[in-house]
Swiss-Prot record:
Belongs to the universal ribosomal protein uS14 family. Part of the 30S ribosomal subunit. Contacts proteins S3 and S10. Binds 16S rRNA, required for the assembly of 30S particles and may also be responsible for determining the conformation of the 16S rRNA at the A site. It comes from Burkholderia mallei (strain ATCC 23344). It comes from the Bacteria. The gene is rpsN. This is Small ribosomal subunit protein uS14.
Amino acid sequence: MAKLALIEREKKRARLAQKYAPKRAELKAIIDDASKSDEERYAARLELQQLPRNANPTRKRNRCAITGRPRGTFRKFGLARNKIREIAFRGEIPGLTKASW
């Protein structure tokens, strides 16, 4: 199981990304707008750089909701592959069955 601090750090990153999403979108729209002057676009770029680093959604890592495992996590369930297997065998995920062909 991952350390609790790592799990909390990811939660903090998710909160920051959500908090600053409108501001980031506004600044990025100004930067991409060719009709704006170069000074306005440059000022928007500087302001974007001043936002917290963890406000960038690309820094967020998907982790298992149970164990905090960073790899092998399925987005659909929010769980790591080994936990999905355990829970599915117990029949706790509706509609999920073991493949057989």
